C-alpha cells in the first residue's frame, strides 16, 4: 500500500510538472467522451486478471479438495511460487508494451494506419526476441530457480514446482505477446477489442482449469489451462492487428481505383 501510494504521488508530481509547461502552440483539449472511450476499456482490461485469479483460486481449490488432494498446498505452489517465477521475465517485457503506445498512437490518430501497424508488429517482434530466450531459460534452469528462490520447500514440493515452471515456461512468450499486442490494439484505437480478448481469455482459463482438474490433471491442469488461454489470447490479438492492416490496405486500394 505504501509503495503504491508513493508511486501515485510521484506520478502526480510528474503530471503537474508537465502541466505547468506552456506549449508553443495552443492544444485542443480532449472531451470527456474521448477520454472515457479509452479509460473505461483499459480499466476493465486491468481488472480482468485479478477477477479471473480470484475465480480460478475458488474453483481450483474446491475441485482439488473434492478430489482428496491438499488443495491449499498445491494451489499455493502454483500461484505463489510458479506464477511468481514466470512473472519475472514477463515483467521485463511489459516495458515494451508500455513503450509502444506513444509511438503507435500518434501514427494511428493521424491516419497513417500502415505505419502504425508496422510499428505495432515491430514491437511484437522485439517482444518475441526477448521473451523466447527467457522461456528457454525458464525451462532449462527451473530446478536452479526453485532452489534459489524457494529454499524452504520439501523435496516433493520442489519437484512439483519444477514441473509447473517447465509446463508454464511458454507463458513467458504468450503472456508477453498478449501484453504487447493488447497495448498495440489500444494504441491503434481499438481498446474494446483488447478488453474483449482479455475477458474471454480469463473465462477460458478458469473453464479449462476446472475441466482439467476434474479430468485428473491435478494442479498441473491449471498450468496447462493457463498455457492454452494465453496462446489463444496472443493469437487473437495478432490476428486482429494483421486483419485490420489487411482491411486498411484493401480500403486504400479501393479508394485509389475510384
Label the predicted regions.
Residues 1-9, 192, 202-235, 242, ...:
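Membrane-interface helix-loop junctions in multi-pass transport and translocation proteins
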Residues 12-46, 244-258:
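Interhelical loop/hinge segments that connect adjacent transmembrane helices in multipass membrane
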Residues 32-36, 79, 112-129, 133-141, ...:
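Interfacial transmembrane-helix starts/ends
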Residues 47-88, 106, 146-154:
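Helix-terminus/linker motif at the lipid-water interface of multi-pass membrane proteins
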Residues 90-110:
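Helix-loop junctions and terminal segments of transmembrane helices
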Residues 133-155:
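Short membrane-interface helical motifs at transmembrane helix boundaries
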Residues 154-181:
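Alpha-helical transmembrane segments of multi-pass membrane proteins
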Residues 172-200:
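Membrane-interface junctions at transmembrane-helix termini in multi-pass inner-membrane proteins
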Amino acid at each position: 500500500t505504501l509503495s503504491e501510494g508513493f508511486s501515485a504521488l510521484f506520478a502526480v508530481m510528474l503530471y503537474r510538472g508537465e502541466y505547468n509547461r506552456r506549449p508553443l502552440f495552443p492544444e485542443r483539449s480532449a472531451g470527456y467522451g474521448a477520454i472515457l472511450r479509452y479509460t473505461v476499456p483499459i480499466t476493465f482490461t486491468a481488472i480482468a486478471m485479478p477477477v479471473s485469479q480470484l475465480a480460478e483460486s475458488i474453483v481450483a481449490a474446491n475441485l482439488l479438495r473434492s478430489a482428496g488432494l491438499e488443495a491449499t498446498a498445491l494451489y499455493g505452489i502454483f500461484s505463489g511460487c510458479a506464477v511468481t517465477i514466470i512473472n519475472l521475465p514477463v515483467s521485463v517485457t511489459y516495458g515494451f508494451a508500455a513503450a509502444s503506445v506513444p509511438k503507435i498512437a500518434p501514427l494511428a490518430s493521424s491516419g497513417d494506419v500502415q505505419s502504425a501497424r508496422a510499428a505495432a508488429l515491430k514491437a511484437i517482434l522485439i517482444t518475441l526476441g526477448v521473451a523466447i530466450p527467457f522461456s528457454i531459460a525458464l525451462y532449462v534452469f527451473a530446478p536452479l530457480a526453485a532452489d534459489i528462490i524457494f529454499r524452504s520447500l520439501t523435496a516433493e514440493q520442489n519437484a512439483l514446482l519444477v514441473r509447473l515452471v517447465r509446463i508454464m515456461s511458454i507463458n513467458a512468450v504468450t503472456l508477453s505477446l498478449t501484453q504487447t499486442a493488447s497495448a498495440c490494439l489500444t494504441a491503434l484505437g481499438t481498446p474494446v477489442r483488447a478488453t474483449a480478448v482479455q475477458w474471454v481469455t480469463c473465462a477460458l482459463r478458469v473453464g479449462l482449469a476446472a475441466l482439467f482438474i476434474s479430468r485428473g490433471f491435478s494442479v498441473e491442469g491449471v498450468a496447462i489451462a493457463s498455457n492454452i488461454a494465453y496462446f489463444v489470447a496472443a493469437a487473437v490479438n495478432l490476428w486482429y492487428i494483421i486483419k485490420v492492416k489487411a482491411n486498411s490496405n484493401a480500403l486504400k486500394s479501393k479508394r485509389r481505383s475510384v
